[in-house]
Amino acid sequence: MIGSIAFLSAILLFSMTASSAFAHMRQLLTVGGKHYLLEVGSQVEPPYVGDKNGVQFFAWTPDPKDPLNDSAKGIKNITGLDKTVTVIVSAGPVSKRLDFTPSPSNTAEYDTTFYPTAQTTYTYTLVGKINNTPIHISYRCVPGAGDDTPGNNTKATVSPGVVRDMVAGGYACPIPKVSIP
């Protein structure tokens, strides 16, 4: 009986944490001549206007055989980016720069907290340096987006020394809370 309760508790805990961050946008980038897989989205999906949320950022050296797969065998976590990268959260004409904190449970993860205050398009822009190269990389929410949002393999220069090789997935824009009477 106790074993069954522990098993069910573990499943419940996993399902709650797994559903809290399922929609992120992945970009395969060449920064200063080196490949990086950067993934950005909201900490809680979908984000609700007025509720605590935040930006969740992951950084890896990609597996050359499967470069957009954040679970690929040859992927390597990138640490220390909280010292060189910040995020600008923009909603229309209003923006705020926030610092990242490294996750204690995942060395590839960086987080920051904010409260979405409007139902509008939010842009998370990573700024700072990666591989000693200045970056300015934007991720824009898309209403109803998720990990299955179609990708794009068109190369594009994002900023000097930064080329986007591929992009896939997406994260949803904030939606209003529904009140239950």
For each predicted feature, which ranges?
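C-terminal segment of classical bacterial N-terminal signal peptides
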Residues: 11-20
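Bacterial N-terminal signal peptides that target proteins for export
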Residues: 1-8
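N-terminal soluble domains immediately following signal/targeting peptides that reside
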Residues: 21-181
